A protein has these predicted regions:
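Flexible, glycine/charged-enriched surface loops at secondary-structure junctions
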Residues: 45-56, 114, 185-199
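Iron-sulfur cluster-binding cysteine motifs and their immediate structural context
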Residues: 77-80, 101-118, 129-146
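Short, surface-exposed, polar/charged, turn-prone segments marking secondary-structure boundaries
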Residues: 43-45, 90-95, 110-112, 168, ...
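Flanking helices and flexible, charged tails adjoining ferredoxin-like Fe-S electron-transfer domains
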Residues: 123-211
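Small-residue-enriched alpha-helical segments and adjacent helix-cap loops
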Residues: 1-105, 118-126
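Active-site-proximal loop/turn and secondary-structure-junction residues that shape catalytic pockets
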Residues: 70, 110, 154
Length: 211
């Protein structure tokens, strides 16, 4: 009996958490899937990959993940390219009543209340839980954007994605465009982005794709 023809896989996968629709933890609730798809379409990645790999399997796909908060339900740390919505927190010392609700809300222990509010930026993941709970608006969202992660993968030699930095959406889309261009320039069958980053060195790769 003739086997039914299998539907061809796309050259990329895009995984978006439900925060784009509804989630109490979402830092940004906007659905940016269309913007990412536009960058992918203009890059020529689909034509490039399908012209070189037959048949196309899941491990050949360029994997993108979008998470609306640091909880990472879309598994951004194992994607080739990922965006995690984040907030930069502003401080208004004069409004602080010293109630301590922010320190209890912070899962990263990034806040302390000795002689005013102190925020340890090296620990803060930008979840904005402190700003949401502060009754005096002493902590507030100063800016929202995305943490850009690059080169995550599982498989035989797994690699957690490394973080490039905090960027606006237009900046992040520009980074995706450059990442795809560099990957196509250096591509060979079986090469994943994480492998390329390790070969080039993270520092050189980040300089090449950064804004």
């Amino acid at each position: 009996m003739q086997q039914p023809e299998q539907k061809a896989l796309p050259a990329h996968s895009l995984k978006v958490c439900r925060g784009a629709v509804q989630c109490p933890h979402a830092v940004l609730g906007q659905d940016i899937g269309a913007e990412l798809e536009t960058v992918l379409a203009h890059s020529g990645w689909a034509e490039f990959l399908t012209g070189r790999v037959h048949p196309l399997r899941h491990h050949h796909q360029f994997r993108i993940a979008v998470s609306s908060c640091p909880n990472g339900c879309s598994q951004p740390h194992i994607a080739d390219f990922a965006l995690i919505a984040a907030a930069r927190i502003g401080l208004a010392q004069e409004r602080c009543s010293g109630c301590g609700q922010c320190t209890l809300a912070c899962a990263e222990n990034a806040l302390s209340l000795q002689d005013g509010i102190h925020l340890d930026q090296s620990r803060c993941l930008g979840c904005a839980a402190c700003a949401r709970i502060c009754p005096e608006d002493a902590l507030f969202v100063e800016q929202t954007g995305y943490r850009v992660l690059l080169g995550g993968k599982l498989g035989r030699h797994p690699r957690l994605a490394h973080e490039l930095g905090f960027f606006t959406l237009p900046q992040a889309l520009g980074i995706l465009e450059r990442v795809l261009r560099v990957l196509m320039e250096q591509y060979r069958p079986g090469l994943r982005l994480g492998d390329l980053i390790e070969q080039m060195s993270r520092k050189k790769f980040d300089i090449k794709v950064g804004p």
